[in-house]
């Protein structure tokens, strides 16, 4: 079974290129969700990426654990170790990503412990993705989350 990947030509007409369906690339794994256009898998992305052939992924979308000051049950890395920790994962994404593929990364900022200043770990991570892995930064998006204060309350002006 194949699926069609959309590519736009210079005159903005759509052309379709045949690509393998994820179920053909990961025959031993059962998709969490699947359509004729693709599939989503639930699991440890580091293990799943290792099973994928080079250049076989059109979209990698992830929200890894943030470098927080307190430990979460799912595990998180200290900001001083974050860049190297994340780059090992990002190199696998880069290997598996198709030449025309996209990598969407949701990475949150944090404040320096005990100070009214922001950490730069997320900026260092983005720079390392470009300089050390080979990604191209295409766009940054900032989203509004009304559920949480964006900083420790004592440092905010309300």
Description of each model-found segment:
Residues 1-158:
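Core catalytic lobe of class I
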């Amino acid at each position: 079974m194949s699926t069609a990947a959309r590519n736009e030509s210079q005159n903005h007409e759509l052309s379709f290129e045949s690509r393998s369906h994820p179920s053909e690339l990961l025959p031993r794994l059962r998709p969490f969700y699947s359509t004729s256009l693709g599939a989503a898998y639930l699991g440890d992305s580091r293990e799943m990426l290792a099973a994928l052939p080079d250049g076989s992924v059109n979209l990698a979308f992830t929200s890894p654990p943030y470098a927080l000051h307190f430990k979460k049950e799912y595990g998180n890395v200290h900001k001083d170790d974050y860049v190297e920790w994340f780059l090992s994962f990002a190199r696998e994404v880069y290997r598996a990503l198709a030449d025309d593929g996209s990598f969407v990364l949701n990475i949150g900022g944090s404040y320096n412990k005990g100070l009214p200043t922001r950490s730069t770990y997320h900026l260092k991570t983005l720079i390392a993705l470009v300089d050390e892995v080979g990604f191209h930064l295409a766009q940054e998006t900032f989203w509004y989350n009304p559920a949480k204060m964006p900083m420790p309350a004592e440092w905010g002006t309300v």
